[in-house]
Regions:
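Extracellular beta-strand-rich solenoid/capping regions of secreted or surface-exposed proteins
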Residues: 85-90, 103-126, 135-164, 170-194, ...
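All-beta strand scaffolds that present successive hydrophobic residues in beta-strands
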Residues: 97, 127-129, 158, 162-165, ...
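Short glycine/acidic-rich loop motifs that flank beta-strands on beta-rich extracellular proteins
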Residues: 106-108, 136-142, 172-184, 200, ...
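Short, positively charged and aromatic/hydrophobic N-terminal segments
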Residues: 6, 12-17
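Right-handed parallel beta-helix/beta-solenoid
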Residues: 37-83
């Protein structure tokens, strides 16, 4: 497929229009609006506050056929949500759900202490959902338990099911914050399930608008925390998400993996939400005002000014015992960590793009028992670092290749803008330069080594003009750089590269 930096539907002019929005309109709204025409979404913020300033992309409208529709040979036509709830519990079917909009109102039957709106117990099914919209409103989610890790809108127990063309969206039919949401829209517990050409519109979480300033998982001291992720894959192997779009507009992950052996995301687009921290100080009521505009998570301190924060968690995130993850031809934008993959086995990214990262673009590591590889990947220098190798296992014998692109025309660097931090042992880093203008002075730095995480016996090829800083724990490395190098380490070899062409040729992995 090749590099797709700005596909036709994601042109810079479209991005600029979205940036002009003072707040996200209801997702059902169509067409463009001026700032004056936009109103607060009271499902996402308190009425007492001014419209929240965000950078977000409006999800596309679903394509629902007005007349005839296709039912493929061998498929059973289902015309109601009640029927659909029953057939997803059976095996070996081909089901066609009649196009239209369906809204669930009540929970499904509990199973093994778990609560959900839909329970897919069946296996070896094909669900043709083209032209259908299945809505899970917060009013229905509020009927589920408030216990952590117990509720999901959809729980897929079965294996080898295929979901084709579905449009799944949350509806904010209660005012913020007078609702509760399920932990995940989808929780996948079976093996070898596949989502193809599906769209997920995820919204609704409490609090909203502050990233993790008031908590994230255990240990938060900032009051009630009700997160909502799109998809969790738990103790399940060989699942696939292909040609799908996720609009993650709530505080939660787009996709998170736990104890997984084999996962593929291919030709996907994941879009989150950003907010300038200066906008928080305009609030008259709510969580920030209650805590005197101070962060309550991992220490009490003032909310920083002049930064850009994500209102979501990570795009694709791994947790314990994850191996054999393959990400290809995928774009993640405006998420906290676009790709946060910490594996015990193989982690491979190919043509994976990160844009306008909310905290960092890439944190890719694997233990010495596996290998992490980034091939032909892409990122910009909009607001936050490209690399964050300060967490997870220290990379060993991993390969990283990335191309740096221009940020959006109307973006401005923040105090956190830069190439970030890399660490590892016997690793190979190649950083290509596709920018058309100089990197912002003062924000053009790549730091090698971090506190107790060294960079040793590695090669770094820096094609950009960024300054490479070698910390004291950088040893026995070869640094080929177009930009300046500050060497505070030991026994390193620094080689000046005079043009980006020379770097590209030398750094080629072909």
């Amino acid at each position: 497929m090749g590099v797709f930096w700005y596909p036709a539907e994601m042109t810079p002019s479209w991005n600029n229009m979205i940036r002009c929005m003072l707040f996200m309109v209801f997702f059902a709204a169509a067409g463009s609006c001026t700032a004056e025409e936009l109103e607060k979404n009271l499902g996402l913020q308190l009425e007492a506050n001014p419209p929240m300033q965000v950078i977000a992309r409006t999800p596309p409208e679903p394509d629902i056929p007005a007349g005839d529709f296709e039912t493929r040979e061998g498929y059973q036509l289902i015309t109601s949500l009640d029927e659909f709830r029953q057939v997803i519990k059976k095996d070996g079917q081909k089901i066609r759900l009649k196009p239209g909009i369906y809204r669930v109102k009540t929970p499904d039957e509990q199973h093994e202490g778990k609560q959900h709106l839909f329970a897919v117990h069946g296996s070896n099914n094909r669900f043709d959902l083209r032209g259908t919209v299945i809505e899970t409103p917060v009013s229905a989610q509020s009927l589920l338990t408030t216990k952590a890790h117990v509720s999901s809108c959809w729980r897929v127990y079965g294996s080898e099911n295929t979901f084709i063309g579905g449009y799944f969206r949350n509806v904010l039919d209660k005012p913020y914050p007078k609702y509760r949401v399920a932990d995940n829209e989808f929780e996948i517990l079976g093996d070898k399930n596949r989502f193809y050409d599906c769209t997920f519109v995820i919204q609704g979480s409490v609090p909203y608008g502050y990233t993790d300033f008031f908590g994230k998982g255990a240990g938060g001291g900032g009051g009630r925390l009700d997160k909502h992720s799109c998809m969790a894959v738990v103790n399940a192997d060989g699942n696939r998400v292909e040609h799908c779009k996720i609009y993650q507009h709530s505080f939660g992950h787009a996709i998170h993996l736990h104890s997984v052996d084999g996962f593929l995301a291919k030709d996907c687009f994941i879009s989150g939400v950003l907010r300038p921290t200066n906008d928080i100080f305009k609030e008259k009521a709510g969580r920030a005002k209650e805590f005197d505009f101070k962060i309550q998570y991992r220490g009490v301190r003032p909310i920083p000014r002049d930064e850009m924060i994500p209102l979501t968690e990570s795009g694709i995130r791994t947790y314990e015992k994850v191996r054999d993850v393959f990400i290809k031809d995928t774009i993640v934008e405006r998420m906290r960590g676009c790709y946060a993959l910490y594996g015990v086995g193989k982690i491979h990214l190919e043509n994976a793009t990160a844009r306008e990262a909310g905290d960092f673009a890439f944190a890719i590591t694997s233990r010495s028992t596996g290998k992490a590889t980034m091939k032909d990947c892409h990122a910009d220098l909009a607001y936050n670092p490209v690399f964050n190798f300060t967490r997870g296992e220290l990379p060993v014998r991993n390969d990283y290749e990335i191309t740096i692109h221009d940020p959006p025309e109307d973006s401005s660097p923040t105090p956190r803008t830069g190439l970030g931090v890399i660490c590892g042992d016997k690793c190979h880093f190649v950083i290509h330069d596709a920018t058309t203008k100089p990197l912002p002075r003062g924000f053009d730095r790549l730091v090698c080594g971090d506190k107790n995480r060294p960079l040793t016996r590695s090669e770094v090829i820096n094609q950009t003009t960024a300054t490479v800083v070698l910390e004291k724990n950088v040893e026995n490395c070869v640094i080929r750089s177009r930009g300046p190098v500050i060497d505070q380490g030991r026994r390193n070899r620094v080689i000046k590269i005079r043009s980006r062409e020379a770097t590209k040729k030398r750094g080629s992995r072909e």
